[in-house]
UniProtKB/Swiss-Prot annotation:
The protein's role, per its UniProt record: This toxin potently and selectively inhibits ASIC1a, an isoform of the gene ASIC1. It incompletely inhibits ASIC1a activation in a pH-independent and slowly reversible manner. This toxin acts by binding to and stabilizing the closed state of the channel, thereby impeding the transition into a conducting state. In vivo, this toxin protects the brain from neuronal injury when administered up to 8 hours after stroke onset.
Organism encoding this protein: Hadronyche infensa
Tissue expr: Expressed by the venom gland.
Domains as described in the record: The presence of a 'disulfide through disulfide knot' structurally defines this protein as a knottin. This toxin contains 2 'disulfide through disulfide knots' that are separated by a short linker.
Protein name in UniProt: Pi-hexatoxin-Hi1c
Keywords for the protein's UniProt record, in alphabetical order: Disulfide bond, Ion channel impairing toxin, Proton-gated sodium channel impairing toxin, Repeat, Secreted, Signal, Toxin
Family from the record: Belongs to the psalmotoxin-1 family. Double-knot toxin subfamily.
């Protein structure tokens, strides 16, 4: 795809610089048909690549605020970390005794993520 774009742009540039009358009809056809298709395909592919590189929910978006996946926005946590969160979610902090696994800094005020013994997930508990 990128080769087709490069060749099309090179042809257009050469035609503009040299103004070859013999190839004028060829250039008109290229501009009318192929070039439009080539650029449309390139834009579509670029969008697909961008969508594949989006940042998932609760993952860091530091330095990439506009790259959260669809339905998510970059939100700055209390402790300075930025993560992608659902746009419609109003309360981002985790309430008392809720799991804070992979969300260590998201406990509500007066709570902290408490590591429990054994193989249990950590929970938000009152600060000690």
């Amino acid at each position: 795809m990128k080769l087709r774009i490069t060749l099309a742009l090179t042809s257009v540039l050469a035609f503009c610089v040299f103004g070859d009358k013999e190839n004028e009809n060829l250039m008109e056809n290229l501009l009318e048909d192929d070039l439009l298709d080539i650029f449309t395909d390139a834009i579509h592919m670029e969008r697909q690549e961008t969508n594949q590189e989006c940042i998932a929910k609760w993952k860091s978006c530091a330095g990439r605020k506009l790259d959260c996946c669809e339905g998510l926005e970059c939100w700055k946590r209390r402790w300075g970390h930025e993560v992608c969160v659902p746009i419609t979610q109003k309360i981002f902090c985790l309430e008392k005794w809720k799991s804070c696994f992979e969300r260590k800094y998201d406990c509500c005020e007066e709570l902290e993520c408490w590591e429990r013994r054994g193989n249990k997930h950590p929970v938000c508990a009152p600060k000690q």
